[in-house]
Amino acid sequence: YRFDLSVPFDVSTCSYAQRTTDLDSPTYQNGSQALDHATHEDNHPQGVSISNDGKKLFILMESNTHDRILEYKLSTPYDLTTMSLVLSAGINLGSHVANPMGMEFSENGKRIFIADHHGSHKEVTQISLGGEFDTSTFTVDGEVNMKTLSDLDQLRPIAFNKSGLKMYLGNDWTDSGDDMVHEFDLVCPFNIIEGKCPPITDNKDRTAMVEAQIEIAKRTIDHSTDTALNRLKWIRRNKDKQNLTN
């Protein structure tokens, strides 16, 4: 379903716009790299993400035997009536997840994060893509199991702030306890796996900060060097004088 908001980010102003038709049909489910959906299986859409330009839509599908991420093309941005399955893309999640509940992309579209819970496992899986919002090539970086956190029961949605240095997980308690949103601080943006921190050049804000720091350092060095050189020149000019304290 698509809803339009007359005031940005204000759900009280939303109105129904459109929806997909027969998302369970082979046209929208079969033929991609993510493998086909068996007709006798459950097939639950558990997460939806859209590329920054509105030209791609991704759906996280959970089923009995294999969970998938399907990639769709929107020939008109954000228009669900123009949606078509991208056959050369898609991810078969295989054994990496067992009960995926939520999905989120990094700001630049080069990583996907999946919240998953099954039994005592409460995991977030990180996947790196070969291109921005392109699931045709990918690498599963790994997962973080949060079973030691007693406040977590069933992970649901996942989100990040714009800088990617904070991660948010929605938690659903089945029988008792309060449903919560948990906040986590990350060492580097959009990364939860050791050794997989993205390069600074992947983030224009971080790049700008580093460039500014380098420029400040260069100016400081230039100023210090100029001061020292000017002092030496003065000493040379006045080397025959007895008093050089000035």
Regions found by a protein language model. Give the residues of each.
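Short loop/turn segments immediately following beta-strands, especially the blade-tip
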Residues: 4-14, 73-82, 128-136, 185-193
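Surface-exposed loop and turn segments in beta-propeller and other repeat-based domains
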Residues: 15-40, 86-96, 139-151
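Signature of short aromatic-glycine-proline-rich micro-motifs recurring in repeat-based ectodomains
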Residues: 35-49, 97-103, 152-159
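Residue-level detector of Asp-centered blade-edge/turn motifs that repeat once per structural unit
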Residues: 52-53, 107-108, 162-163
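Blade-level signature of beta-propeller repeat domains, shared across WD40, Kelch, NHL, RCC1
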Residues: 161, 165-193
